[in-house]
Amino acid sequence: VLLLLCGLSVTAEAQETQKSFKVEVSNTWNKAKADEPVVIKLSEINPQFRVRSAVVMNGSEEIPSQLDDLNGDLRPDELAFVIDLPAKSKKTVTVTLSSAKSDKTYPARVYAEMLVSDKRGKHVPVHSVTIPGTSNIYNQMHHHGPAFESELVAYRLYFDKKQTVDIYGKFNKGFEIKESQFYPTDEQLARGFGDDVLLVGGSCGLGALKGWDGKKSTHIEPVSTLTERIIACLLYTS
């Protein structure tokens, strides 16, 4: 549960403009929450300047955060972060939005990639792909669409009419997709790497938007276009 507290302030130093405000985050459960996602829509804050960076503070401790551009207009639409909350508790964090750019890096918690295979068999990284609904580049997309992972598990999303989520299970905590590319070698498997653990076929996999014809699920088709995009692409250091 989010609550924006009163007392917004705007400060300007040199050419940098800042806006600070407090956000109360509460956990009404009888159970603690780890890495609870918090999303703040910037349109509701109305900073009145172009936001290029943000800082979220829990007392004297900074919480890693990211600004997301959801519609591709090169302007952030939301601020997202995760926070640990004990059972039946509240925390108040201070958010500062700034017009200044930042080269700040945070420890990696996730990884995502989308690769297009060229004629020489090399995999070219891309952040967004849009094709007509009549086109099919399923086999030109390495691992058939975007792949993303936490330290615990990885997924891929098929870039075709199935739009199915597939799962890559892990034996050990850590990141593997950049190295294994969703297809671990025998040597990597011997080192304890995980692997694709689900035969998706024509099913919904872990979950997918499907139609229903009264008897069975159906793919959503035809469509005018297909788009897949990595919304937040940040530089991390570990």
Segments and roles (model prediction):
Residues 64-71, 224-233:
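Short amphipathic beta-strand and strand-loop transition segments with alternating hydrophobic
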Residues 1-18:
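Bacterial Sec-dependent N-terminal signal peptides
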Residues 236-237:
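Conserved small/polar residues in nucleotide/adenosyl-binding loops
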Residues 5, 59-60, 168:
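Residue-level recognition of short, structured coil/turn motifs
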